[in-house]
Regions:
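Central mid-sequence intracellular linker of multi-pass
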Residues: 6-92, 142-149, 166-188, 202, ...
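Generic, low-specificity signal for short hydrophobic/alpha-helical stretches with a mild N-terminal bias
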Residues: 61-68, 74-81, 98, 109, ...
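Primarily residues marking transmembrane-helix entry/exit sites
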Residues: 87, 91-95, 236-241
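A single, central transmembrane helix in multi-pass transporters
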Residues: 93-103
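C-terminal transmembrane bundle
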Residues: 102, 106-346
Length: 346
């Protein structure tokens, strides 16, 4: 409907829609940061409470906070602390690998409109529907306990929770069982996830399934370009299903890497969940922005086949980062934990 109106109509629509969302947030959304709101039962004040609380009675479970409470202060260190994680070798390797996959997925997604409109002559509605395979597969490998930044989301969420979530949980439980057996711990003992022992192989547990997922991502990305490069093939009836299916696998495998990567970075930064999420988003979104900026020139210069083959080879080029992390990551993590213990004791 908006495509039939003047060019500014869509921006006016987005302005109205975003304004309604902001108003709803101001009126109804309370502060959820645990250090401020606790488990949701603490009385909020100032900007932390929604405006609706000014006109209604507090729920019966609301309690006054301890008088000794002092609100967390925002200082320069608050913004610098996430950047300091880049000094850690194992964390940096995880961020670079995850950022590379994110950039390539973003390049596939951002180039879809131009390629499909040119090759398959789709209208605006059909172009929108072409994103469904990408979007539903985003949730195919989405973890319910891991944050992702994917803008395309669909019914695959249900399937995703049972695939990558179960795979990662199984790998972690297997590693935990082996650790208990080797250390003579009772079967009922559960390792504290926020304070894992230095000799627990968390890197192996988290990266166990990354190898085949990355291989499938490389194959799908490389084949995707060639599925769009030959007019004699792309003109065949129903051929559009082939690149759409490959997009499904590209999005599914890339989002599996995102979920694994975010979990891995969080495990390497116990107690720094906000900082690890912030630096992960900063790195991969920066790399994604660079990729989106050059993808059109890459396709124009090499064609879809050559361009996406190069992107597949780029992924292969960063796979050694996983190998390095697999073998040397545990040592670097133990060294970091040792420095932390020494710092706390001094």
């Amino acid at each position: 409907m908006l495509t039939s109106r003047p060019g500014r109509s869509i921006f006016i629509f987005l302005l109205i829609l975003s304004s309604l969302v902001i108003i709803a947030i101001i009126f109804f959304l309370p502060e959820t940061l645990r250090s401020i709101a606790g488990n949701g039962s603490l009385r909020l004040a100032g900007i932390h409470q929604p405006l609706i609380r000014c006109f209604t009675k507090d729920p019966p479970y609301i309690q006054d906070r301890d008088g000794a409470y002092s609100p967390p202060k925002v200082t320069a260190k608050t913004f610098i602390e996430p950047l300091l994680l880049l000094k850690e070798k194992d964390i940096l390797l995880s961020l670079i690998f995850g950022g590379t996959i994110y950039a390539i997925w973003s390049m596939v997604t951002s180039s879809t409109t131009g390629l499909f409109k040119q090759i398959f002559h789709l209208n605006e509605l059909q172009l929108g529907l072409a994103f469904l395979p990408n979007g539903t597969s985003t949730f195919l490998f989405h973890l319910p306990f891991v944050q992702t930044d994917s803008p395309y989301q669909g019914l695959g969420t249900i399937v995703g929770s049972t695939i990558i979530g179960n795979l990662m949980n199984q790998a972690y439980r297997a590693a935990e069982d082996d650790y208990r057996t080797s250390h003579g711990l009772p079967a009922s003992y559960s390792l504290p996830k926020k304070a894992l022992p230095a000799d627990f192989p968390i890197e192996h547990a988290r990266l166990k399934h990354t190898k085949w997922i990355t291989a499938l991502f490389v194959i799908s990305t490389s084949a995707y370009g060639f599925s769009l490069s030959t007019p004699a093939i792309t003109s065949l009836p129903g051929w559009i299903a082939v690149p759409l299916l490959l997009q499904f696998f590209i999005a599914a495998t890339s989002n599996a890497v995102f979920a694994t990567n975010q979990t891995m970075v969080s495990d390497l930064c116990p107690g720094k969940g906000a900082s690890s999420t912030a630096i992960n988003n900063l790195v991969r979104c920066s790399m994604g922005a660079i990729g989106v900026a050059i993808v059109e020139q890459l396709i124009a210069g090499m064609g879809p086949g050559g361009a996406f083959l190069v992107l597949g080879l780029v992924t292969v080029a960063v796979v050694p980062l996983l190998v390095v992390q697999w073998y040397w990551g545990p040592m670097w993590r133990r060294e970091r934990m040792g420095r932390k213990v020494k710092g706390a004791g001094s």
